């Protein structure tokens, strides 16, 4: 990455296929990486990040993302399995997933059976999302967003599986269209 805050960080893009990410996706991913491994303020600056790209509404997947059995290589279930195969110890998913597919359930179960921790965002829909996001499955650590005073952010979702919180703002992140913080 070219973000100055990540200079010297151990980050490897392990995406199994071509994903063209929007500026918003790049900014979000870089901000999450910086919160983890930035040398000045990351919570685990010596950690190694294996990065896997999901496809969001403004992103596009390459033709090499077609997978087997109808599961594309850039889908959450496939990426979780790839991370397991790559030796991940903690899987942090800073997005929500309302699909709730059987392959996703089994990928999460496989991670849990191998002692791999999965933490996932509760979502940004400002409602109870107990039945529709990653944390609906036992063992996934659901994370809601709070402000610097410990109050849930107005936009953040919550639910039965939410057992943790992380500061969701105000946080300065790099704007990749301008390069500014």
Predicted segment positions?
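Solvent-exposed loop/turn segments at secondary-structure junctions
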Residues: 1-2, 17-18, 41, 55-59, ...
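Extracellular S/T/G-rich loop segment that most often corresponds to the catalytic His/Ser-adjacent loop
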Residues: 132-181
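Extracellular/periplasmic catalytic domains that process cell-envelope and extracellular macromolecules
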Residues: 42-44, 84-85, 111-113, 134-137, ...
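Short hydrophobic/aromatic-enriched beta-strand-loop microsegments
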Residues: 12-16, 141-144
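Proline-centered loop/turn at the N-terminus of a beta-strand
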Residues: 48, 115-117, 141
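Short pre-catalytic strand/loop immediately N-terminal to key active-site residues, enriched for Gly-Thr
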Residues: 17-24, 177-181
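Subtilisin-like serine protease catalytic core
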Residues: 1-12, 20-71, 100, 138, ...
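Substrate-binding/access-modulating region of protease and related hydrolase catalytic domains
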Residues: 58-135
